[in-house]
Amino acid sequence: MDLTKNPTCIESLDPVLQGGFPSGSLVLLLGEIGAGEFEFAISSIARLLNRPKQDTCTLFPNKVCYISLTRGKDDVMKEIAFSFPEFYNMIKDRLEFKDLSEAFFARSFIPINWRCSLQTELSFDSLKWDKEEENLIVALIDYLDKKAYGSIVIIDSLTVLAKHCLERMEWKDLIMFLRGLQKASKKWDGLVYTMLSEGIFEKNKQEEIQDCMDGVMVFEWDKQGS
């Protein structure tokens, strides 16, 4: 039985978790808009990458993968640079970034010069759909199967993914996908974080999403004095 854990490297949190999340966990970062779920994920991986490998009961990732469904790498890295200047150089050299925004925006009305990188020249070939653009879910599954083993993965975000899926499938199919993702995460033996904005879905549906997870962390604005 594998009892290793993935620490968050947040000093106030790991003792509560008795060392961290069990390896193979799918963890939902559920938060009000801008309440800190992104900052938690980045702070955690930065501290983990900077931590000496000493504890044999602690699992250190093979790699850290950031999967973005709508934002390009430069956009995300700029936010990290502003929010965590002390960690930026270390993260940029060790973070494997996967941009699935082309798949997300494919066949939408968004003009190609908006969704493509500045380096992309408009041509006949650039207007063709590649395999990754044809199906966002298939592209995500394929990437996870190749990269998630022993890794920490951040999926940005479940809010975007769920809304995209529900335009193409029923609610029960989305829940089935999430349960499959939770099961697959055990095989990958790493840690998968995914972010969901509070209040996007009805309360019972949000709770159904939470039920698919191994753990849920809730981020809220301090309402003291309001």
Task: Describe each region flagged by the PLM.
Residues L26-L30:
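Short hydrophobic/aromatic beta-strand immediately N-terminal to the Walker A/P-loop
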Residues E32-E121:
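Conserved P-loop
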